[in-house]
Amino acid sequence: MQAVDFNSDMGEGFGPWTIGDGVDNELMGYISSANIATGFHAGDPGTMRRTVERAKALGVAVGAHPGFRDLVGFGRRHINASAQELVDDMLYQLGALREIARAQGVRLQHIKPHGALYMHLARDEEAARLLVENLRVIEPELLLYCMPGSVICRIAQELGQPVIREFYADREYDLSGSIVFTRNVRGYEPQAVAERVLRACRQGVVRTVEGQDLAIEFDSICLHSDTPGALDLVEATRKALDAAGIVVRAPR
């Protein structure tokens, strides 16, 4: 692998409150794409605007990061809603960030659902298809960040919506190829995460929770800003990529 995108979730505070270590400003200097929270699981209009401004200043690509209506649970709890309700909510959030970004002269590069909604769309045919069908109408060139081999990835490829397949640096995988979703995120050793990423980039494999290697193809590395010690993890990973001659750049 000669080049890869490096993305992280940004703007996931709310008013005066922050999530994780509160290191968005510093972390932004190491990534190429920012997934900006759009108000339902975290974020607010002012935070969205400031995060777009910071990304623009650093040349970081911007994407919408819509979630379930779950501020209290940070979007990590599943909400039992119809496919139409979920897509209505996602389009609402997408539109909000799109206009805030447009006011700054920034065009959205991508959309990446958050947390439990990301996992729901990875498995639910009806909601995934309805979202992609709507994206084909309103934003046919918008990149859709998703898990390789997931339901939404397959549907997007089938319908012609461009996809960016992700590798999660700070989440565990099982042999099905899925990340192991958790509400209780633990810390990681920076060097171990960096080595895991380099192994995925060079060899195309990741060690699963079952203790076996899983082949994986991806276009972007994700490392979450709310993971404990996120700044150290991102810094170590970026330095390792640079030292290996792997160029970090946004897909567009």
UniProtKB/Swiss-Prot annotation:
Catalysed reaction, written as an equation: 5-oxo-L-proline + ATP + 2 H2O = L-glutamate + ADP + phosphate + H(+)
A Pfam family the protein falls into: LamB_YcsF
Protein's GO biological process: carbohydrate metabolic process
Cysteine disulfide partners in this protein: none
MF-aspect GO terms: 5-oxoprolinase (ATP-hydrolyzing) activity; ATP binding
EC number from the UniProt entry: 3.5.2.9
Domain of life: Bacteria
Keywords associated with the record: ATP-binding, Hydrolase, Nucleotide-binding
Protein's UniProt keywords contain DNA damage: no
InterPro entries: Glyco_hydro/deAcase_b/a-brl (IPR011330), LamB/YcsF/PxpA-like (IPR005501)
Enzyme class: hydrolase
Signal peptide: none
Protein's UniProt keywords contain Ribonucleoprotein: no
Coiled-coil residue windows: none
Membership in a protein family: Belongs to the LamB/PxpA family.
Role, per record: Catalyzes the cleavage of 5-oxoproline to form L-glutamate coupled to the hydrolysis of ATP to ADP and inorganic phosphate.
Subunit structure: Forms a complex composed of PxpA, PxpB and PxpC.
Name recorded for this polypeptide: 5-oxoprolinase subunit A 1
Organism: Pseudomonas putida (strain ATCC 47054 / DSM 6125 / CFBP 8728 / NCIMB 11950 / KT2440)
Lineage, top ranks: Bacteria, Pseudomonadati, Pseudomonadota, Gammaproteobacteria, Pseudomonadales
